[in-house]
A protein has these predicted regions:
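Cytosolic, long alpha-helical scaffolding segments
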Residues: 1-206
Length: 206
């Protein structure tokens, strides 16, 4: 591998690591939820998102200067954006809880957050294999596993939204959780989009 190529894969690996940390921190926040401490939680969560933004800027600068890239620069740019979106959306879950002044956490939210940890763990494995995608014997199975987790999240979303509507007693609370669960679903979709991007790159370059 050319020395310059390693930058791209390392950058993606660092972003995937940040996503794993952010997802794990979200679970920690929800399992130990305290509305009086949510501003501090948001500050901590933002450090992960900000670090991911910096990695995206580094990628943009490198792509702008590069004469040759290991795969199409448009694909590298798209993947960088999609990884950043994962971090943005994980942070947004907590932001919405602050916006809607959520006082207690629904069990389904913790369940969803734990599935996001699983999705981000698989994403980290995919990115680790991506560096050697032409020889990897694991990458296809990992992409399938990522899709499986997204399907689990889809099922959880449908069940949770049904129960939320069926048991609704307060419009504001129902609307608040509706928006939060939408954000959880967007998170799981974003993880799958990264894995699909990797799959597309592999298909075009092997």
């Amino acid at each position: 591998m050319a020395k310059g190529d390693k930058f791209y894969y390392d950058n993606f690996a660092e972003c995937a690591s940040l996503a794993k940390k952010a997802a794990a921190y979200l679970v920690e926040c929800l399992e130990n939820y305290d509305l009086s401490k949510i501003e501090k939680m948001l500050e901590e969560m933002h450090t992960f998102e900000h670090s991911a933004d910096m990695k995206k800027h580094e990628m943009n600068e490198a792509l702008a200067k590069a004469f040759v890239t290991p795969v199409d620069r448009e694909d590298l740019d798209l993947m960088s954006q999609q990884l950043d979106t994962v971090l943005d959306l994980i942070e947004e879950v907590l932001q919405k809880m602050y916006i809607y002044n959520i006082k207690t956490i629904e069990p389904a939210a913790i369940d969803y957050a734990k599935r996001l940890v699983k999705a981000c763990d698989i994403l980290g494995d995919i990115i680790a294999e991506f560096e050697n995608f032409k020889k990897s014997k694991k990458l296809h199975a990992l992409i399938v596993a990522s899709n499986d987790v997204e399907e689990e999240c889809d099922k959880l979303y449908l069940t949770t939204m049904h129960e939320l509507t069926k048991n609704s007693t307060d419009v504001l609370t129902t609307l608040s959780w509706y928006k939060i669960y939408d954000c959880f679903e967007a998170c799981s979709d974003a993880c799958e989009h990264v894995s699909e991007c990797v799959g597309s790159i592999v298909m075009k370059n092997t």
